[in-house]
Regions:
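Outer-membrane beta-barrel "beta-signal"
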Residues: 203, 462-470, 487-501
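Repeated loop/turn-to-beta-strand initiation elements of outer-membrane beta-barrel proteins
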Residues: 154, 180-182, 208-215, 239-245, ...
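Outer-membrane beta-barrel initiation region
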Residues: 70, 76-82, 104-245, 281
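Hydrophobic, lipid-facing positions within transmembrane beta-strands of outer-membrane proteins
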Residues: 168, 197-201, 227-231, 269-273, ...
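C-terminal outer-membrane beta-barrel translocator/porin domains of Gram-negative envelope proteins
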Residues: 299-302, 306-439, 443-445
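Transmembrane beta-strands of outer-membrane beta-barrel proteins
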Residues: 182-184, 213-217, 242-246, 287-291, ...
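Solvent-exposed loop/turn segments connecting transmembrane beta-strands
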Residues: 163-164, 189-198, 219-229, 266, ...
């Protein structure tokens, strides 16, 4: 992420250690390294151990310098250079000085239309390195945390300082992205009772108020009057950068199909406040923490019986995300702990009962490009609870996000596990086209029931995208003991849309 063309001025060194006749036969006993840069001393000693006990000569001394310089550079010290000060060694101990560039001035090129105050706040952690030895790993960690806001692009590059020798000036470019974006999509991921065909419009704005903030609106509907509205907003308020955000959602439904005569309908209203903190970041890894609280008011009506069921749900949650990014491998993991309190406010009785439970969810995805255009993608989702959970928190083993050969309304449970193993090959790059085959399984169980139900399926599909347009199609077939509960002999799923980000 950081680029440089730094050079250091080094003093002329007299290699009197190796050239003096009195020490030609000396063996190397120890290497003393002096530097203001911080490294793992044990790891450095391990690198130099193979040279100990060998006869000191020009080749050995040069190899040691190369080894030390290379180690410092790999550990983030740009343009680090090891050299020997003038010295005489009579006991096989040599001294090495490692010179590294220090950070002088920092220039912010604000092409992202941020307010000066916001640009200054976000780069505060970078400015803390001024006057210190430049370590690209530490600087990259700070810059990547800013980049992870996904509001603008950021890049940095070093040049030799015009003010101080062996110092570097850092320029940070903040480049704005398209300020407004949208996405239109269609899919048949719904179910028969609430609408199989779903239509979604998403609108988003980046850097909405020029404070690196983000806002979005999501509107969704189905062919059977299920409607959803989601409003969200987030803004960084510290230099970490810690993010504060909120989300408001409203949904309504009317059950059709076999429920027409009962006139079943309902709605939900809710909100969520959260804080997101980046705990750790490198070029190939990331750890984030999110904590928040939420409120939901849910109402279900059966109008043919004049029956109304109401309940409120309050809760708090913690979410840990740990990700690893390599050239041929991405590994994403999320653990969420949710404490919920449900209050029953239905008009069936005067009883205002309430119940509380702790719910944990773990999601993992491994994407391994093991050979040329072939990838193995392993997806795992696990839900665990010690008590029966609210209907809104149930694990869904079927549907488009589970074992897709089964309808999403077939079953739900308190506990569950979903696993999808997919072999995928990329056929084209422009337009992008892939093909995959996969095996899916899900296991579901309720807290108060000992019996576990299992669902299995095999499938295949393809994804294509070009210039903002995308299309995903798949077909799956149920296998195993519960295959007779699959509504169709083969389930076809389709999603298509256009996104302008």
């Amino acid at each position: 992420m950081l680029k440089h063309k730094l050079t250091l001025s080094l003093p002329f060194v007299l290699l009197s250690i190796a050239l003096s006749p009195s020490v030609n036969a000396l063996e190397l006993n120890n290497v003393i390294i002096k530097s203001g840069a911080r490294i793992d001393k044990k790891a450095m000693d391990k690198k130099l151990n193979p040279y100990l006990g060998k006869e000191i000569d020009i080749a050995l001394l040069q190899n040691i310098l190369n080894e030390i310089s290379d180690y410092y550079r790999k550990n983030g010290y740009l343009a680090a250079q090891a050299f020997y000060p003038e010295q005489q060694s009579q006991n096989g101990v040599v001294e090495v000085i490692v010179k590294t560039a220090k950070l002088d001035d920092i220039k912010i090129s604000n092409y992202a239309s941020l307010t000066p105050k916001t640009a200054y706040m976000l780069t505060e952690n970078v400015r803390k390195f001024q006057g210190k030895e430049i370590n690209s790993h530490e600087l990259n960690a700070s810059l990547l945390k800013i980049k992870d806001l996904n509001i603008f692009d950021i890049a940095g590059y070093f040049e030799n300082s015009q003010n101080k020798a062996d110092h570097a000036s850092l320029t940070i470019d903040l480049k704005g992205r398209s300020r407004f974006g949208y996405e239109l999509s269609y899919d048949n991921y719904g179910n028969e009772s609430t609408g199989k065909n779903r239509y979604t419009l998403s609108l988003n704005s980046l850097n909405l108020s020029k404070h690196a903030d983000k806002g979005y609106i999501i509107l969704g509907t189905t062919d059977k009057k299920q409607n959803n509205l989601i409003l969200g907003y987030s803004i960084p308020f510290t230099s970490h950068p810690t993010i504060f955000g909120f989300q408001f959602n409203y949904g309504s439904y009317e059950l059709g199909d076999t429920y027409d005569s009962l006139e079943v309908k309902g709605n939900s209203l809710g909100g969520n406040l959260y804080i997101k903190e980046p705990l750790y970041r490198t070029l190939d890894s990331r750890v984030n923490f999110t904590g928040g609280g939420y409120y939901k008011a849910l109402t279900d009506k059966i109008e043919s019986y004049s029956l109304e069921l109401k309940r409120n749900k309050f809760g708090g949650y913690f979410d840990f995300e740990a990700s690893v990014f390599k050239e041929d491998l991405n590994f994403l993991n999320t653990l969420k702990l949710d404490y919920g309190l449900v209050q029953d406010k239905s008009n069936l009785s005067d009883d205002k009962s309430q119940r509380a439970y702790l719910l944990s969810n773990f999601d993992s995805k491994l994407d391994w490009n093991f050979y040329k255009n072939y990838s193995l993608i392993n997806t795992l989702s696990v839900q665990y609870a010690q008590k029966a959970v609210d209907a809104s928190d149930k694990f869904i083993p079927g549907g488009a996000y589970g074992v897709s050969a089964y309808d999403g309304s077939l079953a739900s449970s308190d506990l569950g596990m979903f696993h999808d193993l997919k072999l995928q090959t990329k056929l084209m790059s422009k337009p992008y086209l892939d093909f995959f085959v996969n095996f899916m399984q899900a296991h579901a169980q309720n807290v108060e029931v000992e019996k576990k139900e299992s669902f299995y399926a095999i499938g295949s599909g393809s994804n294509i995208s070009y210039g903002g347009f995308y299309l995903s199609a798949s077909v799956s077939k149920a296998i195993g003991k519960n295959k007779e509960y699959a509504k169709d002999s083969a389930k076809f799923l389709l999603k298509a849309g256009y996104a302008k980000i």
